[in-house]
Curated annotation (Swiss-Prot):
Sugar-binding protein which recognizes specific carbohydrate structures and agglutinates a variety of animal cells by binding to cell-surface glycoproteins and glycolipids. Calcium-dependent lectin. Invertebrate lectins may be involved in defense functions. Residues 25-152 form the C-type lectin domain. Disulfide bonds join 26-39, 56-150, 125-142. InterPro entries: C-type_lectin-like (IPR001304), C-type_lectin-like/link_sf (IPR016186), C-type_lectin/snaclec_domain (IPR050111), C-type_lectin_CS (IPR018378), CTDL_fold (IPR016187). This lectin binds galactose. Keywords: Calcium, Disulfide bond, Lectin, Signal. Homotetramer; disulfide-linked. One of its GO terms (molecular function) is carbohydrate binding. Transmembrane segments: none annotated. Coelemic fluid. Residues 1-24 form the signal peptide. This is Lectin BRA-3. It comes from Megabalanus rosa (Acorn barnacle). The keyword Calcium applies.
Length: 162
């Protein structure tokens, strides 16, 4: 083996080692909570839904209004978050009755409370409603000020989760 091949092999080993031993963490700037490869942060202040989207991006690059993709994730958030009505990324702003996540993720899971979404007085934005035991969701007027929930992938880990 020539010297250049040895250097290449050692470099490759160092890179693989660095990737596999990378510390996967949530940002340290706020009280982020970790669950299933993602970090969650509940705001301590209230804003309108559109401003909440911008606030998540400001709090940490790559953060967005939370998506909730399973009953287990919803239960984690319900147990972790102390605020009781939080904006999430779910909305039907573009097409009434067709709820989508603001970050483009598929809307495969929903957990609406009974008779919701109801679009009462033009309610187009999703709220997690943790003041009930069930943690079900509601739709509300996007122009109301509410606390909000940000979500982002854990940082420091390769996408494949090695």
């Amino acid at each position: 083996m020539q010297r250049s091949e040895i250097v290449q092999a050692v470099t490759l080993l160092v890179v693989v080692f660095a990737i596999t031993t990378a510390e996967c963490t949530c940002p340290g700037n706020l009280d982020w909570q970790e669950y299933d490869g993602h970090c969650y942060w509940a705001s301590t202040y209230q804003v309108r839904w559109n401003d909440a989207q911008l606030a998540c991006q400001t709090v940490h690059p790559g953060a967005y209004l939370a998506t909730i993709q399973s009953q287990l994730e919803n239960a984690f958030i319900s147990e972790t978050v102390s605020n009781n009505r939080l904006w999430i990324g779910l909305n039907d702003i573009d097409l009434e009755g067709h709820y989508v996540w603001s970050n483009g993720e598929a809307t495969d899971f929903t957990y609406w409370s009974s008779n919701n979404p109801n679009n009462w007085e033009n309610q187009d934005c999703g709220v997690v409603n943790y003041d009930t035991v069930t943690g079900q969701w509601d739709d509300d007027d996007c122009n109301k000020n509410k606390n909000f929930l940000c979500k982002m992938p854990i940082i420091g880990c390769p996408p494949c989760g090695i």
